[in-house]
Amino acid sequence: MDIQNIRAFLMVAETQSFSRAAEKLFLTQPAISKRIATLEDSLDCQLFDRLGKNIQLTQAGQALIPSYQRILSEINETRRIISTLRSEVSGHLKFGTSHHIGLHRLPPILKKYTKLYHQVELDIQFMDSEQAAALILKGSIELALITLPDEIENHLSTIPVWTDTMFCVVAKDHVLAKQKYVTIKQLSEHGVLLQAQSTHTRDIIDQALKLNPEIKIIMESNYLETIKAMIQNGLGWGVLPESMIDGSLHRLNIKGVKMERHLGVLLHASRTLSSSANALLETLKNSN
């Protein structure tokens, strides 16, 4: 049922004139007449009696007025609600984040976000990048803040937010810390603590360093904080983002090696985001 036809019917009923109804709706009289005729055809009944220059509602027309007024009122209320949702940021926001972003990038963002949008209830889940993609496709979470892959699945899209430069590091008293420059061959002679296989960060490391398959891997972990703690205690060397390298670690100089990863937002390309999710994206955008 066409809402414009209902509006035309109610205006003709109110003014008892096709010409006056046309003026009020900024239409031509033939356009008003066509809308009424279309409505009558769809209902298979006559709504107005044409009595010369005068018109009069039929019994069917009179019966329809309360229903059509209620329909228009409900439509206007629905539009008001949608407009309010667009202007007011509230509700429930469920999203995922990697442990690294959740610990090192997200806290100042959330501090600003919760101050601006205190009515939003946050549900933050820590997860791997691969798990986040599956949950977004399933619709379980709206978005995720993760290490962005070079290639993404169909129906997903990404928004880069941060660039993480990564370096090989050792403890201050590690034998490699005494070297001005270190080669890949020298790295391969020492035990290493690496990110877990099949993670995007591990793929970047493997492509950049092309390590000997026989290298001694002391430990693999998804948690960079765990890897950092092990390196600090002299268990081996590893790769960490610049933001995690402090005075307890020594950065190794390796000629020709550059490692970068991109952190940002992963979301469903076809999903309409809530006002709270859009507000988070805006906060992230303004954070850089």
What is the predicted function of each stretch?
Residues L10-T28:
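Short helix-boundary/capping micro-motifs
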Residues S90-E153, I215, E220-Y223:
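Central regulatory/effector-binding core of bacterial HTH transcription factors
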Residues D128-I141, T147, H200-L252:
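Hydrophobic hinge/microswitch elements
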Residues L116, M127-H190, E242-S248, K258-M259:
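Acidic, Gly/Pro-rich loop/turn segments at junctions of secondary structure
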Residues T147, H190-N212, L273-L281:
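Secondary-structure junction motif
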Residues E40-L57:
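A short LG(V/I)-centered, amphipathic sequence patch enriched
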Residues N253-N288:
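A late-sequence structural motif
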Residues S42-L43, L64-R86:
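Alpha-helical linker/hinge and terminal dimerization helices associated
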